[in-house]
């Protein structure tokens, strides 16, 4: 805020001050690794999202707000920052909530509680988080109460949509009849309508001319609603502050008796006990109940338009074809046929204390405890599309977690004339513990029991349980020095010890360094009014990855029944599954980043340009072993990967008047991801494990190249390959006159050549309008349904209309 000077005259008993926004406000303060700093002092690559941006996207999951940020890509619901590095170890970024590593999903955080999100992308920014920062860091800062009167805020929205499968078109009754007859004619079983009994089920014959049932259209084109309601109460004085918030979200499903309900409760309290001591509690409770139904899209695609959904009495027709192997997909809507319910309870408690030891010297201690419990149960009987057994089945699984993190941060910030120094030292401990138990069985006495009375199951009972614990200890140091707001140097280190790895390999050291030059503060540019910011920066650092199962290096066994003495009785035993790997090393990542931050016309045009080059060494990989080894798989360090690319972000304010504001944000992101070395440097590919040097570690489409359809005038040539006209023509790449495994090739990858985003925000008085566009270009997608369920198959198994 800009400073204000107000004169106080004689007899004036109150003063009202309205602070005006300055270029350096909350949005210019960035959270970076256990501390905060002004954006102008940052030496690494950091992208930020404000609460305004989040509020303009009324979404259930704050992941939506991250789309469009340069360097971030959504991959199947997962967040990827600057590419994928590892094949089997985790590629997920670290989430830090109010300074504490947060192991739950972003969906468990109420978007309305968020003040800002800062995304750390380069190694100098993430190295301070060591092994957990290898895939980038997402720092979330929640809203706090502001000084003033008690405020009560309500926020809500309602969204509507349609479950539409796009342009998918299915056959009506007449088209289906013609298709069945033509298909049977081609198979030699149909010559005239007298042969219809060979092409159709009896029920279909009886319904010809009477029934034309659009199974899919009636089911999937249903309207859906999304609702969200938030209520917040907050107040603060110069000593105390509190904020209590409640949020409820509901999302309808495409299926009846299905949907998700989310409940959030937040309570933040802080109090300045002494002039030098501040304590507080931050708590977040999250409860979700999910009633799910199975994906029945394939089953609907198999339904004939000549069959009925319901019987004459209004009940569902269980077997529309009169065939026990083809059931009515609508049956799964009934809870006494199929019910799948999950409940999750999560609690996040953070106790903190801040002690001002001396001028510029502050000690912060944070202890976070996050217990969680989840319970899932499902039940379905033989009327369900998902089940073919004559008996019903019940299953239940309970999972209990108890994680805690304790970090102690000592920081020193001082300014001496033109010199600024910022020192940070951290000691951190983490503990994760999980206990789970599962039970399943068949032949429940009554559907009313569902999974709540597992003792009454009479067949195929199965019990299992597990316990997992992992720990980590870290020591962190960081120093930043700047001279005259022009030259900035940052260095950090982190030493991590992880229990997942074997003795002798548990510890790893991660250093980093960065420099920045604020060119706009040089005398030759400082007086150029249209340049508000120009900063050149470079960084280099190392991070690591140890994200494997807690006991992976020890090897595992699994149960198996076997015949030991040649008799008929099989007895339980154990056999090796994964081979012990006591020499497993840390996966390490080194990254170089060179960037330019710029701002013109007092910040109305600003942005960043970054080039980065990241190399990962000794990839953690769960390798498939040959049967002769006696093991199925083994963890190993297999090779190296590389991610390099460009990021460009541009924000502008083309129009700014008293009543109208127009903002435009553009982003561009290009990343080349490749495997550069296998465990054996002479190897260029490991087809058995899907690894190819020069290509991404996953997402590679390695298959036969289809070049068309064999035509009637190519019958002789097709016969050479054992094919005939009408079948798919596959390229004979090695030219040996036959199609075999040697004709497979790399068709492409799921990685896009580039990603772009556009955001437009217009505000007129109290009305705002926003548009968000996000696109990926150059990737190759494989649609499994197009090559299976939608493929050209005979008869009732496909009603998808194909234009040949």
Go through each PLM region and give its residues:
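Short aromatic-centered micro-motifs
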Residues: 95, 310, 481, 733, ...
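Short, small/polar-rich motifs associated with maturation and membrane association
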Residues: 1-266, 273, 278-280, 348, ...
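Extracellular/periplasmic, surface-exposed regions of secreted and cell-surface proteins
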Residues: 54, 91-92, 262, 268-277, ...
């Amino acid at each position: 805020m800009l400073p204000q000077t107000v004169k106080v005259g004689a007899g004036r008993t109150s003063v009202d001050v309205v602070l005006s926004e300055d270029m350096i406000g909350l949005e210019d303060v960035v959270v970076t690794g256990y501390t905060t700093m002004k954006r102008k002092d940052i030496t690494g690559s950091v992208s930020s999202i404000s609460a305004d941006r989040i509020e303009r996207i009324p979404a259930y999951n704050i992941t939506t707000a991250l789309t469009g940020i340069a360097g971030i890509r959504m991959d199947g619901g997962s967040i990827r920052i600057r590419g994928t590095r590892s094949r089997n170890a985790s590629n997920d970024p670290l989430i830090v909530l109010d300074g504490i590593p947060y192991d739950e999903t972003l969906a468990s955080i109420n978007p309305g509680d968020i003040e800002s999100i800062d995304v750390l992308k380069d190694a100098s920014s993430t190295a301070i988080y060591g092994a957990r920062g290898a895939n980038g860091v997402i720092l979330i800062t929640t809203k706090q109460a502001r000084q003033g009167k008690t405020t009560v805020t309500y926020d809500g929205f309602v969204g509507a949509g349609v479950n539409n499968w796009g342009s998918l078109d299915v056959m009506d009754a007449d088209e289906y009849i013609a298709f069945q007859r033509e298909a049977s004619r081609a198979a030699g079983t149909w010559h005239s309508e007298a042969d219809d009994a060979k092409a159709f089920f009896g029920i279909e014959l009886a319904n010809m001319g009477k029934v034309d049932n659009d199974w899919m259209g009636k089911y999937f084109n249903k309207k859906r609603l999304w609702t969200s309601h938030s209520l917040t109460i907050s107040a603060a004085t110069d000593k105390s502050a509190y904020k209590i918030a409640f949020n409820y979200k509901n999302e309808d499903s495409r299926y009846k008796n299905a949907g998700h309900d989310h409940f959030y409760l937040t309570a933040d309290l802080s109090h300045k006990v002494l002039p030098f001591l501040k304590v507080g509690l931050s708590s977040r409770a999250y409860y979700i109940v999910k009633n799910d139904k199975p994906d029945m899209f394939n089953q609907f695609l198999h339904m004939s338009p000549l069959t009925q959904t319901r019987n004459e009495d209004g009940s569902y027709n269980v077997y529309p074809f009169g065939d026990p192997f083809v059931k009515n997909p609508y049956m799964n809507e009934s809870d006494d046929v199929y019910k799948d319910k999950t409940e999750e309870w999560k609690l996040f408690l953070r106790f903190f204390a801040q002690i001002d030891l001396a001028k510029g010297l502050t000690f912060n201690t944070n202890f976070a405890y996050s217990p969680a419990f989840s319970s899932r149960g499902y039940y379905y009987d033989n009327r369900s599309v998902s089940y073919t057994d004559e008996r019903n089945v019940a299953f239940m699984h309970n999972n209990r977690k108890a994680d805690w993190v304790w970090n102690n941060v000592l920081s020193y910030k001082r300014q001496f004339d033109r010199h600024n120094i910022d020192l940070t030292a951290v000691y951190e401990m983490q503990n994760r513990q999980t206990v789970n138990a599962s039970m399943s069985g068949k032949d429940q006495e009554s559907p009313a029991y569902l999974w709540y009375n597992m003792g009454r199951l009479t067949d195929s009972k199965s019990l299992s349980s597990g316990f997992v614990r992992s720990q980590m200890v870290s020591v962190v140091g960081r120093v930043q020095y700047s001279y005259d707001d022009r030259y900035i140097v940052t260095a950090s280190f982190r030493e991590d010890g992880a229990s997942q790895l074997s003795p002798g390999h548990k510890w790893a050291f991660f250093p980093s360094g960065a420099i920045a030059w604020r060119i706009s503060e040089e005398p030759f540019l400082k007086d150029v009014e249209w340049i508000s910011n120009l900063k050149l920066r470079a960084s280099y650092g190392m991070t690591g990855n140890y994200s494997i199962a807690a006991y992976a290096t020890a090897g595992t066994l699994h149960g198996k029944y076997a015949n030991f003495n040649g008799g008929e009785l099989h007895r339980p035993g154990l056999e090796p599954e994964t081979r012990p790997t006591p020499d497993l090393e840390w996966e390490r990542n080194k990254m170089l980043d060179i960037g330019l931050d710029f701002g013109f016309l007092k910040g109305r045009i600003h942005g960043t340009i970054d080039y980065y080059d990241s190399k990962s060494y000794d990839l953690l990989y769960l390798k498939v072993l040959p049967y002769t080894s006696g093991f199925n798989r083994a963890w190993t360090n297999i090779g190296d990967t590389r991610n390099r690319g460009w990021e460009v972000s541009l924000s502008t304010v083309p129009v700014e008047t008293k009543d109208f504001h127009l903002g435009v944000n553009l982003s561009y992101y290009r990343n080349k991801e490749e495997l550069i070395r296998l465990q054996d440097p002479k190897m260029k590919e490991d087809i058995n494990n899907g690894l190819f040097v020069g290509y991404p570690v996953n997402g590679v489409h390695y298959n036969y190249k289809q070049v068309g359809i064999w035509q009637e005038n190519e019958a002789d040539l097709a016969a050479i390959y054992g094919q005939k006209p009408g079948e798919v023509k596959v390229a004979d790449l090695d030219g040996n006159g036959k199609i075999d495994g040697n004709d497979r090739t790399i068709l492409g990858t799921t990685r896009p050549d580039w990603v772009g985003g556009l955001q437009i925000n217009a505000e007129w008085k109290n009305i705002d309008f926003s548009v968000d566009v996000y696109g990926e270009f150059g990737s190759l997608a494989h649609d499994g349904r197009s090559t299976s369920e939608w493929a050209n198959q005979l008869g009732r198994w496909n009603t998808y209309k194909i234009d040949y």
